[in-house]
């Protein structure tokens, strides 16, 4: 009898380039924390259906956040399962792009929670 293993996601890996940009936004006071930004990225990724790709160059030190800090109740994982990290990276790319355009996190939240994508 084959024993079925339940694979748990414990860590959402983000690239060094994303981590540097998030640190810059945190220092400027645009975001409260990296964990918050990844949580917002996961929500945006799920709402838009966008998954992360190797958009930024990978390599160097690993950067990321603990999954429990992003999704303590497991709601995102219930919605998308093991793909939570890919949705988080996709949404994080959207969030970073919007912040680089000078938008506030409130504008970004309002735009994507209302379902607008333009």
Where are these regions (language model features)?
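Short, basic amphipathic alpha-helical segments that act as recognition/interaction helices
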Residues: 32-56, 99-104
